[in-house]
Amino acid sequence: MAAAAVDPMVLGLGTSGGASGSGVVGGGVGRAGGGGAVMEGAQPVDLARHPSGIVPVLQNIVSTVNLDCRLDLKQIALQARNAEYNPKRFAAVIMRIRDPKTTALIFASGKMVCTGAKSEEHSKLAARKYARIVQKLGFPATFKDFKIQNIVASCDVKFPIRLEGLAYSHGAFSSYEPELFPGLIYRMKQPKIVLLVFVSGKIVLTGAKVRDEIYAAFENIYPVLTEYRKSQQ
């Protein structure tokens, strides 16, 4: 697949604040410190789980839930705060809450998509809050079939990467067309994760259903990235 096919919103990189995909790669990262101690913020990092000493930071969780009732979207948009509805543009109410800072897409069928949360727990909490808002507007909404659909994370390996060499040697998994998209797209088979690798050393990982897939994918790719570390002039 050509690099042009990568849409940041499809990957779940868009957040509730409408940030562009490129803004995702600036997240924090845990790295090995002196004496072998590894810290992420104030939290120690388990080297058995993260041998690289780098912990990808979750940036966006996309989840879905079934409210299990038909909804009058026009009524919801008129009565709810922080809600907008323009059926000519998009067939869903767009609703936002501040805590957790998220955006929901609410469809007339009762299906809902929640995006923008930074953890699985916050995604579920936000989805429950949206469901309660709909209930308070008079709809018999329930909370069925909650599911994490995509986890997006980012990290920084702190060294530049020779993307041309990586693309050549890993052509079966890689797509790199810098005139169309600045990053190399690496489609890992196991776990089935898509990685966006940038020359700066910034990495975006997407396509996971559970966070351990993110961690496993990064530990798989990290030794490969070190092979293509660009020598500093």
From Swiss-Prot:
UniProt Sequence repeat ranges: 58-134, 148-225
Subcellular location: Nucleus
MF terms in GO: DNA binding; RNA polymerase II general transcription initiation factor activity
GO biological process: DNA-templated transcription initiation
Alphabetically ordered keywords of this record: DNA-binding, Nucleus, Repeat, Transcription
Statement: the UniProt record of this protein carries the keyword Glycoprotein: no
Entries under InterPro entries matching the protein: TBP (IPR000814), TBP_CS (IPR030491), TBP_dom_sf (IPR012295), TBP_eukaryotic (IPR033710)
Keyword DNA-binding attributed: yes
Predominant localisation class: nucleus
TM ranges: none
Pfam families: TBP
SUPFAM superfamilies: TATA-box binding protein-like
Gene Ontology CC: nucleus
Coiled-coil boundaries: none
Family, similarity comment: Belongs to the TBP family.
Assembly mode: Belongs to the TFIID complex together with the TBP-associated factors (TAFs). Binds DNA as monomer.
Its job: General transcription factor that functions at the core of the DNA-binding multiprotein factor TFIID. Binding of TFIID to the TATA box is the initial transcriptional step of the pre-initiation complex (PIC), playing a role in the activation of eukaryotic genes transcribed by RNA polymerase II.
Listed name of the protein: TATA-box-binding protein 1
Protein's organism: Triticum aestivum
Phylogenetic lineage: Eukaryota, Viridiplantae, Streptophyta, Embryophyta, Tracheophyta
